[in-house]
Each structure stands twice: as structure tokens, then as C-alpha cells.
A protein has these predicted regions:
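Helix-loop module immediately N-terminal to the HCX5R catalytic loop
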Residues: 81-89
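C-terminal functional extensions of proteins
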Residues: 43, 47-50, 55-56, 61, ...
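Residue-identity detector for threonine
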Residues: 5, 24, 31-32, 93, ...
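Residues at alpha-helix caps and immediate loop-helix transition turns in enzyme cores, especially N-
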Residues: 4-8, 34, 62, 110-111
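Glycine-rich phosphate/diphosphate-binding loop of Rossmann-like nucleotide-binding domains
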Residues: 1-16
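Active-site rim loops that border cofactor/substrate pockets in soluble metabolic enzymes
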Residues: 12-47, 52-53, 60-81, 136, ...
Length: 145
């Protein structure tokens, strides 16, 4: 995670004062923002579901950040089948809070499909927990316009 990397860099700087590190601009803004959001919502959650591919290090770090911040019930959900397994393996008898986030490359359509599935099974009260406003816009290449 970004936090783990910072800790390692600090130890290296103490041991090697003249060391030159990578620019902090090299870390994807979306990765940093999502990790900050998971940290800030962790104390409100009984579970954290991270939507993303199993081979996505970004998504795996989000699960780790949630666990490190006190949500031991944090899971990577890559598709509807994973969500079904999650829902079938837990007995949700009480009101619970599920934090939902997605890796930087997770398609928004998958996020919406999984939210719809949760709404069909439970009474859902969605709260958009925005920590950082992402206002960076990437233009499509000319060949795709």
C-alpha cells in the first residue's frame, strides 16, 4: 500500500541520508485516493468489498488497507460469482455496514451490477463517501473520437 511504501522509504532515508527516491507523482492518483477512502471509511464498516480483478495489485492493496485499518472481513470481489459466494457464506441476521470500493481499473458497469444484486437481497442505504474529488479528465485518443 502507499502507507507501507512510505514507511519503507523513511527507513531507507534514515539509513542512507543521500538516497534519492521516486517522485511521489509516480503513484497513480486513483490508487492513492482509493486507499485514503478505504482508510477513512474503515471504522464505519463491518465488511469491505473491493471490486477488482484477482490479478490487480491495486485491488489487492485495497483489501490489505481495509484489513490493516480494522476490517478483518475484507474481500476481493471480481465478478457476480464471487459476490454470490460471499453472500452465501455469511449469515447476515443483523444490520451491517458494507463498505464498497473498486480498484482503479474495475469497470463501473460491474460496480453497478453488484450494487443492484445487493439491493435485490437486502435493504440498502447507499452513502457516497467521497474523500477526494477526482476531477481529472482523460480525453479519448483522436482515433477513438
Amino acid at each position: 500500500s502507499v502507507d507501507d511504501t512510505k514507511e519503507i522509504i523513511e527507513v531507507l532515508k534514515q539509513r542512507f541520508p543521500d538516497i534519492k527516491g521516486p517522485s511521489t507523482e509516480d503513484i497513480c492518483y486513483a490508487t492513492t485516493n482509493r486507499q485514503l477512502a478505504v482508510k477513512s471509511m474503515a471504522d464505519m464498516c463491518d465488511y469491505v468489498l473491493v471490486i477488482g480483478a484477482q490479478n490487480s495489485s491495486n485491488s489487492q492493496r485495497l483489501v490489505e488497507v481495509a484489513k490493516k485499518n480494522g476490517v478483518s472481513n475484507s474481500y476481493l470481489i471480481s465478478d457476480e460469482d464471487d459476490l454470490n459466494i460471499f453472500l452465501n457464506n455469511f449469515n447476515f441476521t443483523d444490520s451491517i455496514n458494507i463498505g464498497l470500493t473498486a480498484g482503479a481499473s474495475a469497470p463501473e458497469t460491474l460496480v453497478q451490477i453488484l450494487i443492484s444484486k445487493l439491493k435485490r437481497k437486502f435493504e440498502v442505504n447507499l452513502i457516497n463517501h467521497e474523500v477526494v474529488k477526482e476531477d481529472i479528465i482523460f480525453n479519448l485518443p483522436k482515433s477513438l473520437r
